[in-house]
Amino acid sequence: MRRLIDKTLVVASHNAGKIREIRDLIGPLGFEAKSAADLNFVEPDETGTTFEENATIKALASAKASGLPALSDDSGLAVDALGGAPGVYTANWAEREDGSRDFQMAMEKVEEALRAKGAVKPESRTARFVSVLCLAWPDGHVELFRGEVEGYVVWPPRGTSGFGYDPVFQPKGYDTTFGEMSAEEKHGWKPGDSEALSHRARAFKLFAETCLGA
């Protein structure tokens, strides 16, 4: 495993909600985090079929364009009754014809698909959020970290915090959705903590322990 020495890196994302969460998680570690959006980098085509492949595509593109280490996140909601969908195509389910993204529409699509399967009771609506972080260097070296959190898809959506599918995901052991939690509650982790709640925080915990010794 390669240690990260630089204190400036690029967040390889154009997703405002994701950039905010990554900055919230990496800020306490003392990093200055620029984003691919801030630097006007072109978004690479995510042609991978796994979270790991897409995270690597994004991180390498930003690392090579900036000459700095880059950190990407590829994440999604995997619903068991839907065979793991939306999965790596989580963002695609939110795409409108004009290219914009509408996650209210995406959540409705998931709910419609579940009802079509007769998945009404909580035990038939199990799901997990997956996050894969990729840390890439300009020389092409990459490190990957995967975090998952188990839960259920609920309906109707609850809460206005977070982003994406957060209002319909209720983690196991909780009676609130990610959309009803503050950022601190959702992640449940800061450097040095032994536990984390969200998928992204669990991936960050591995990243911090492995590449930073934190």
Swiss-Prot record:
<keyword id="KW-0460">Magnesium</keyword>
<dbReference type="GO" id="GO:0036222">
    <property type="term" value="F:XTP diphosphatase activity"/>
</dbReference>
<comment type="subunit">
    <text>Homodimer.</text>
</comment>
<feature type="binding site">
    <location>
        <begin position="13"/>
        <end position="18"/>
    </location>
    <ligand>
        <name>substrate</name>
    </ligand>
</feature>
<feature type="binding site">
    <location>
        <position position="74"/>
    </location>
    <ligand>
        <name>Mg(2+)</name>
    </ligand>
</feature>
<feature type="binding site">
    <location>
        <position position="45"/>
    </location>
    <ligand>
        <name>Mg(2+)</name>
    </ligand>
</feature>
<dbReference type="GO" id="GO:0009117">
    <property type="term" value="P:nucleotide metabolic process"/>
</dbReference>
<feature type="binding site">
    <location>
        <position position="186"/>
    </location>
    <ligand>
        <name>substrate</name>
    </ligand>
</feature>
<feature type="binding site">
    <location>
        <begin position="163"/>
        <end position="166"/>
    </location>
    <ligand>
        <name>substrate</name>
    </ligand>
</feature>
<keyword id="KW-0546">Nucleotide metabolism</keyword>
<dbReference type="GO" id="GO:0035870">
    <property type="term" value="F:dITP diphosphatase activity"/>
</dbReference>
<comment type="similarity">
    <text>Belongs to the HAM1 NTPase family.</text>
</comment>
<keyword id="KW-0378">Hydrolase</keyword>
<protein>
    <recommendedName>
        <fullName>dITP/XTP pyrophosphatase</fullName>
        <ecNumber>3.6.1.66</ecNumber>
    </recommendedName>
</protein>
<dbReference type="InterPro" id="IPR029001">
    <property type="entry name" value="ITPase-like_fam"/>
</dbReference>
<dbReference type="GO" id="GO:0046872">
    <property type="term" value="F:metal ion binding"/>
</dbReference>
<feature type="binding site">
    <location>
        <begin position="199"/>
        <end position="200"/>
    </location>
    <ligand>
        <name>substrate</name>
    </ligand>
</feature>
<feature type="binding site">
    <location>
        <position position="75"/>
    </location>
    <ligand>
        <name>substrate</name>
    </ligand>
</feature>
<comment type="function">
    <text>Pyrophosphatase that catalyzes the hydrolysis of nucleoside triphosphates to their monophosphate derivatives, with a high preference for the non-canonical purine nucleotides XTP (xanthosine triphosphate), dITP (deoxyinosine triphosphate) and ITP. Seems to function as a house-cleaning enzyme that removes non-canonical purine nucleotides from the nucleotide pool, thus preventing their incorporation into DNA/RNA and avoiding chromosomal lesions.</text>
</comment>
<dbReference type="GO" id="GO:0036220">
    <property type="term" value="F:ITP diphosphatase activity"/>
</dbReference>
<dbReference type="GO" id="GO:0009146">
    <property type="term" value="P:purine nucleoside triphosphate catabolic process"/>
</dbReference>
<dbReference type="Pfam" id="PF01725">
    <property type="entry name" value="Ham1p_like"/>
</dbReference>
<keyword id="KW-0547">Nucleotide-binding</keyword>
<feature type="active site" description="Proton acceptor">
    <location>
        <position position="74"/>
    </location>
</feature>
<dbReference type="InterPro" id="IPR020922">
    <property type="entry name" value="dITP/XTP_pyrophosphatase"/>
</dbReference>
<dbReference type="InterPro" id="IPR002637">
    <property type="entry name" value="RdgB/HAM1"/>
</dbReference>
<dbReference type="GO" id="GO:0005829">
    <property type="term" value="C:cytosol"/>
</dbReference>
<keyword id="KW-0479">Metal-binding</keyword>
<dbReference type="GO" id="GO:0000166">
    <property type="term" value="F:nucleotide binding"/>
</dbReference>
<dbReference type="GO" id="GO:0017111">
    <property type="term" value="F:ribonucleoside triphosphate phosphatase activity"/>
</dbReference>
